[in-house]
Amino acid sequence: MTVATTVRKAVFPVAGLGTRFLPATKASPKEMLPVVDKPLIQYAVEEAYAAGIRHMIFVTGRSKRAIEDHFDTAYELEAELETAGKEALLALVRSVQPDDMDCAFVRQPRSLGLGHAVLCAEPLVGNEPFAVLLADDLMVGPQGGQPVLAQMVTAFRQQGRSVIAVQEVPEDQVHKYGIVAGEPAGGQLMRIERIVEKPKADVAPSRMGVAGRYILTPGVFDEIRNQPRGVGGEIQLTDGIARLMAHEAVYAFQYEGKRYDCGSKEGFLEATGELALQHPQVGATFRTYLKGLSL
């Protein structure tokens, strides 16, 4: 069967409750928490856009209206900025949703796991390959190089099969990740032979952890739909990918760049601090401030 190798659509599962960040997330989506001057979800959308993707699909839940509003046209705000002659701010606001990008939203009625969230997007994805980006994982590509998802799109075009971003994780963190093992397939690729969701360190097949970026072929939908519930009683995306491997190759991709685990407070603070230092407007001032601290 010929598999399309153009990735046109990206799925963003954003229905989670964000309990680690309470009370900040009591009424606001965790994906809208700002890292310097942009909400977390915007970094993921910009990464998808930079990879050539123009159709963004958000799988949402209750209390997520702010995400829809953020990626909508703010007519009143734009009019006020235009009247005030604030052209730079107006351009910044409009850049959130470029003219050639469209956004669609679908509800995940119950929190049944990441696999279920991806399955909720099937009617909008259709029978074509698609990307999945977890906003909790803020990915920064190498300086002067491609963003992480763009690297993966290149690998997918070469292989025509599902590609999953991976990184080596510390042994004491293995139980927090989907873990893969397999055989080298050239360059940064490994053909996956085993994938396990959140194993204990002593039984994990490796220390290569899945890093929140996927490019998947549409065959994964049937596998998710027909699988039993897995770890935590949830419908796991990892289990669907494991079932897909019985029918077609799936590759792990060791990306170039850095991942910030913004699902944790520590990772969120690391991202905020390091991206603030790189920010063209506040970086120098912030660096001076940090040097003056008595740590």
Please name every model-derived segment:
Residues 40-43, 116-120, 240:
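Well-ordered alpha-helical segments embedded in enzymatic catalytic cores
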Residues 77-80, 87, 93-182, 216-218, ...:
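Conserved beta-loop-beta/alpha segment of the NTase-like Rossmann-fold superfamily
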Residues 1-6, 288-295:
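Basic/polar N-terminal segments that are highly enriched at the extreme N-terminus
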Residues 32, 103-105, 162-164, 250-252, ...:
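Conserved beta-strand scaffold positions in the cores of enzyme catalytic domains, especially
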Residues 131, 143-147, 153-157, 184-287:
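Catalytic-core segments of class I nucleotidyltransferases/pyrophosphorylases
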Residues 2-86, 144-150:
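N-terminal glycine-rich phosphate-binding loop and ensuing alpha1 helix
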Residues 9, 54-56, 102, 129, ...:
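Residues at the starts of beta-strands that form the adenosine-phosphate
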Residues 12, 58, 132, 164-165, ...:
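Structural beta-sheet core signal
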